[in-house]
Amino acid sequence: MNDKRVFNHVENNAGNEEEVFRVKREFSETAEIIPDLTALDDEREEKQALEGELLASQFEQAVRPRFRWWKRAVIAVAVLFLGATVAQSVQWLIDTWQANQWIYFAFAVVGCSVVGLGLSALGREFLRLRKLRQHLALRAESAVEFKDDFEIDKAKKLCGEITSSLGMDAQHPTVIQWQKQLNDGLTAREVGELFSKNVLYPIDNKAKKLITQSAVENGIVVAISPLAIVDMLFLAWRNTRLINRIANIYGIELGYWSRLRLMRMVFINMAFTGATELVQDIGLDWLSQDITAKLSGRIGQGLGVGLLTARLGIKTMEFCRPLTFNKDEKPRLSHIHRELLTSLKSVVLRSDKSRKKQNV
């Protein structure tokens, strides 16, 4: 009799693989597609970082222009001319004194005084320009030093140099408050952030208030004034004064040439950024403001001039600040445009009502 044979079924053989079933996906034609904007935000942040580095390099090129051979030749000729003028003035003074020609001696004294005043003015301009270059170098160094992989001692030393450039000593209340928050567990970047929040934050608020005040005043004057030439001259004077006052807030004393170079960099930066940054700063609120501005041409003019003044002040503030702004610290036009629009509407509409009453 044959033996019974039993066959066992092996489910997981080396030659047989288990078939995997997946859930069927169905797509609706009317379903709303919500894109993932995370990649776009990251790309925008990278673009802003690259743009900031580009603007910093442009500012450095504006303050430190390249010396070409013809510039060196002009400087050499100017130095020789000044030296010859000083030598001739001194020689004229000595000759008239020895010859007892008192009238010519008086003219020689006046000439030497004028030459001395000119040399002192040139010396002050050179010192102010040098201070602006030192501020630029300090700002560029702070952009590199305040990173996680740098030493804390270097970051603290750099903060001390920035404090000295701002005209503060170690006993200043904000500096003492910053020093109390320091400990060995902090990184260089965190040291810079604490310094910015404690020491630079009050200075930033002062500059922001000045920018808002200037923007509102310029917008109101342009909205009320009927003369375009007067508006242009007024804005040129006010904007130049705004740049000087912001620079003084951050401890920078501008001379003639340093002021021209700073203004040049600010205007170049404003031209490069253009309307794109303006729309990003203001956002969708611009649409409602535009509709309101269409109700009155004067409100529209005042709004445009006020925003231009505010943008000029913000760019000057960015270049004069010894530390670069973080993403949350950077001032934006959206912080100013509401107050500007409210002030313009109240002033212009009030003037319109008064004129109607006078006509009646």
UniProtKB/Swiss-Prot annotation:
Membrane topology: Multi-pass membrane protein
Coiled coil: none
Pfam families assigned: DUF697 (PF05128)
UniProt xrefs under InterPro entries: DUF697, UPF0283
Transmembrane feature ranges: 74-94, 102-122, 215-235
Subcellular compartments: Cell inner membrane
Keyword annotations of the record: Cell inner membrane, Cell membrane, Membrane, Transmembrane, Transmembrane helix
GO cellular-component term (any): plasma membrane
HAMAP family the record matches: UPF0283 (MF_01085)
Recorded family membership: Belongs to the UPF0283 family.
Name of protein: UPF0283 membrane protein Asuc_0957
